[in-house]
From Swiss-Prot:
Entry keywords, A to Z: DNA-binding, Metal-binding, Nucleus, Repeat, Transcription, Transcription regulation, Zinc, Zinc-finger
Entry similarity comment: Belongs to the krueppel C2H2-type zinc-finger protein family.
Protein name per UniProt: Zinc finger protein 789
Alphabetized CDD domains for the sequence: KRAB_A-box
Family annotation (SUPFAM superfamilies): beta-beta-alpha zinc fingers, KRAB domain (Kruppel-associated box)
A GO CC annotation given for this chain: nucleus
InterPro entries: KRAB, KRAB_dom_sf, Krueppel_C2H2_ZnFinger, Znf_C2H2_sf, Znf_C2H2_type
GO biological process, one term: regulation of transcription by RNA polymerase II
Task of the protein: May be involved in transcriptional regulation.
């Protein structure tokens, strides 16, 4: 048996209509107004096609003529049912008739057919409204169900404003896709362009679609390799304005030579040439003692201190000297920090945990560093370096006074003691 149906005469257009105040109407853009007009007219046409009999509402007459003044003159939502206004010349509403059992069955059958037609109509409406969630939050049909309850059987009221807070936020700026209100006019205008299907630009090279023309023009420079932004000082051209702005800082800081790889600027061309070797991996500076190569001359000079044995960096606390400043800084932590790291084997304390770990290798006999020539292992890396001199035969430690060379640093230090008291002529 088909579900009971509600009589067509009991359902009027006012049940599916929606009205606005003057203030609410002013907050809608043209795209939203057109959408509202299409939905109301389609609701009315569907009800007529489905056999609902009632006079043509004045609202539909005004919408067909697209006269905006109707929204300001028609009665408010709260008392619109009492008005019952209709277009001039329309017939009065049909009175209810008492149906016979046969007529009741016919009405039930027709109602079931109507529900199928309404479902198809609702799916078409849903396709039009799915992009405007904030404008139409609930737009679907309620179909007849079994039981004594009569379903409304048609498109429910457009829920433009769900609650009072939502209405306030709508007037201030409406919502984004996540349901959050826009708090900036620029974001709102960008959102409205989407709602009104603003014109988009498609790249003919890669097919990418870009909404704004400025972004589209900037994107096309990637394909055509255009550099329209030129520096007036040196003539160098750039693809983007932001890159030109960064480049201008080189001239303002009196650093006209800029590295194209990292953007760093230099005062002299020689500095730029030396810097570029970092990117090209070029190492033209070679140590004459160990043949190790370097990309910068300053790095070579720091390296040569190892061979000369010179220790210019001296600790003011204990007088110990070091060849590198970084080594001195590590040493000074011994004086500035308490020796909180204590060896459990011998009780010796250290200021750094890394020193304690190295010290513990003496007790554990662990040997992590292996010689590639003979396979011998060592607990400390410095011991491995001293051992490798045996295989290479190099004598990296040279006396600057007599020119004699030594394999071991300890031998070099002992030799320098023989020159004490000598005065250079």
């Amino acid at each position: 048996m088909f579900p009971p149906a509600r009589g067509k005469e009991l359902l009027s257009f006012e049940d599916v209509a929606m009205y606005f105040t003057r203030e609410e109407w002013g907050h809608l853009n043209w795209g939203q107004k057109d959408l509202y007009r299409d939905v109301m007219l389609e609701n009315y046409r569907n009800m007529v096609l489905l056999g609902f009999q009632f006079p043509k509402p004045e609202m539909i007459c005004q919408l067909e003529n697209w006269d905006e003044q109707w929204i300001l003159d028609l009665p408010r939502t709260g008392n619109r049912k009492a008005s019952g206004s209709a277009c001039p010349g329309s017939e009065a509403r049909h009175k209810m008739k008492k149906l016979t059992p046969k007529q009741k069955f016919s009405e039930d059958l027709e109602s079931y057919k109507i529900s199928v037609v309404m479902q198809e109509s609702a799916e078409k409406l849903s396709e039009k409204l799915h992009k405007c969630k904030e404008f139409v939050d609930s737009c679907r049909l309620t179909f007849p169900t079994s039981g004594d309850e009569y379903s409304r059987g048609f498109l429910q009221n457009l829920n433009l404003i769900q609650d009072q807070n939502a209405q306030t936020r709508w007037k201030q700026g409406r919502y984004d896709e996540d349901g959050k209100p826009f708090n900036q006019r620029s974001l709102l205008l960008g959102h409205e362009r989407i709602l009104t299907r603003a014109k988009s630009y498609e790249c003919s090279e890669c097919g990418k679609v870009i909404r704004r023309k400025a972004w589209f023009d900037q994107h096309q420079r990637i394909h055509f390799l255009e550099n329209p932004f030129e520096c007036k000082v040196c003539g160098q051209a750039f693809r983007q304005r932001s890159a030109l702005t960064v480049h201008k800082q080189c001239h303002l800081q009196n650093k006209p030579y800029r590295c194209h790889d990292c953007g760093k600027c230099f005062r002299q061309l020689a500095y730029l040439v030396e810097h570029k070797r970092i990117h090209t991996k070029e190492k033209p500076y070679k140590c004459s003692k160990c043949e190790k190569t370097f990309s910068q001359n300053s790095t070579l000079i720091r390296h040569q201190v190892i061979h000369s044995g010179e220790k210019r960096h001296k600790c003011l606390e204990c007088g110990k000297a070091f060849g590198r400043h970084s080594t001195l800084l590590c040493h000074q932590q011994i004086h500035s920090k308490p020796n909180t790291h204590k060896c459990s084997e011998c009780g010796q304390s250290f200021g750094r945990n890394v020193d304690l770990i190295q010290h513990q290798r003496i007790h554990t006999k662990e040997e992590f560093f292996q010689c590639g020539e003979c396979g011998k292992t060592f607990s400390f890396k410095r011991n491995l370096f001293r051992h490798q001199v045996i295989h290479t035969g190099s004598q990296p430690y040279q006396c600057v006074i007599c020119g004699k060379s030594f394999k071991w640093h300890t031998s070099f230090i002992k030799h320098q003691g023989t020159h004490k008291g000598q005065i250079s002529t």
